[in-house]
Amino acid sequence: MNTPAPYRRVMAIVNATPDSFYAPSRSEGEGAVARRVAECVAEGADIVDIGGYSTRPGAEVVPVEEELRRVVAAVEEARRVAPHTTISIDTFRSEVAEAVLSRWTNVVINDITAGEADGRMVEVVAHWGAPMVAMHTRGTPQTMQSLAHYEDVVAEVREYLARRAEWLTSKGVKEVILDPGFGFAKSVEHNFALVEGLNTIGALGYPLLAGISRKSFICRTLGVEPTDGLALAGTTALHWECLRGGAAILRVHDVAAARATIELFEKTYKL
């Protein structure tokens, strides 16, 4: 995957958490994950991204034992209804990654710290031969927004991701996907600059993941809540721009809308 991807995929967000910022994405209770996954796959999801630890700005720390419990239970449910769909695990903890990779195949590890938070993560991912999403952020969910200071956000994010991708590859990670980290240690202006400059990050030669779905920089600009219909409209407009910038994967709450956006984009540009 270390070349621009000749495809565009939809990654559906499935949160096995009680505190993710977009309440409808939370899958709690008996069978909730299975229902959410089945719905996402029916709407055209290529990948299902499961998280047991909300990493929104200001989120509370979750003990590793609780994250493990949530994630393993969620993957078990997901695999029952979608045995052949790629599963992505949204975690920065090697214990969680290893618990899933040792039990299931066709798994991606989506690490918001690009392997920096846990020194064993790269070893685990390389050992199991899993693809890895490496995201740009600063600090922790508790401190990140106080660290949103850049001279040139696009250049600095690009430089960071280039270094991390090279390092991960040198440590044996065979498939690296880059994520500029929209909303993570970024101001509203930084996020829009990254949308505009996404193609310069794509020039590094790795597939790009864009995770902008209903995020606060869209909602603040439009003066709406994440659950508002205009938040989806804004997301869709910027998804188009991300696709123009070379995004290979859209990480989304609204699968059908993202799938339609990709279909129309490819029709427009005869791709």
Residue ranges and their predicted role:
Residues 1-5:
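N-terminal and secondary-structure boundary signal
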